[in-house]
Amino acid sequence: FGAAVIGRVLEAEGYRVAIVPQPDWHGDFRDFKKLGRPRLWFGVAPGCMDSMVNKYTANRRLRSEDAYSPDGRHDLRPEYPTIVYSQILKRLYPDVPVILGGIEASLRRLTHYDYWQERFRPSILCDSGADMIIYGMGEKAVVEISNHLQMAIEDGNAHLNYAEDGTARVGMKTFRDVITHGHCIPQTVFIYNKEDIPGGIVPDDLILHAHETCLKDMKAQAENFRHIEEESNKYHAQRIIQPTGGRYVVVNPPYPPMTQDEIDHSF
């Protein structure tokens, strides 16, 4: 499972990791609060299968069991858990960065067709309120992000919050300064205002049809899909930018493929 692998990778780098599996999203959200505010960031990864495929059949009937839940229970995760969990975390901890990962976020990083709702939806960053996506294999990105934030704390450059025990905790200002606008980390997705895009829009960027154009023209979405798939399979991909709702979804190119030693280290 991805969350377990990512947790072990971060532990190997010296970070302390807590995993809350299938938190209860009803009532007082106690599962989201039981471990308190994290020092660096929240990660949301709703599973190794798309949640809607896991919950419903192709005929849109509720599946009788969930193969990835205790006792096969199918009521332990909501529909679109990435969106539900992220919105709850932002409501409870608005100043803590929320990072999305896993197949659900990766497949929805740009305009996409939702089979269940029969309509095009924008990047999941728009619906969830999260701060960034790590798409694909996330081992390198989570370590790089965490290291940059840790270095900002150690250098005294961070806008910090402090726990009762004096532990420094990263807030959104630090995250924006160090990650969103400071380092161009591969395999990540952000939403920017045009003037805030790192380096500005350059000729090498691949500019997709705007989300609003795709809503009116299915051929525009088909062209976007072809470009996205082509760039996903290139060794040296372009940065992808899509105008969405007056802002810009920016997809940074992926890391080079992991070497055998790197894969062995992760697993």
Q: What do these predicted ranges mean?
A:
Residues 2, 21-244, 251-252:
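Glycine-rich beta-alpha loop elements in corrinoid/cobalamin-binding modules
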Residues 5, 245, 262:
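Solvent-exposed, flexible loop/coil residues
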Residues 5-17:
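Short helix-loop-beta junction
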Residues 7, 122, 263:
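Short glycine-/small-residue-rich flexible loop motifs, especially phosphate/cofactor-binding loops
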Residues 11, 125-126, 267:
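Alpha-helix boundary recognition
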Residues 258-267:
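Long hydrophobic segments that form regular secondary structure
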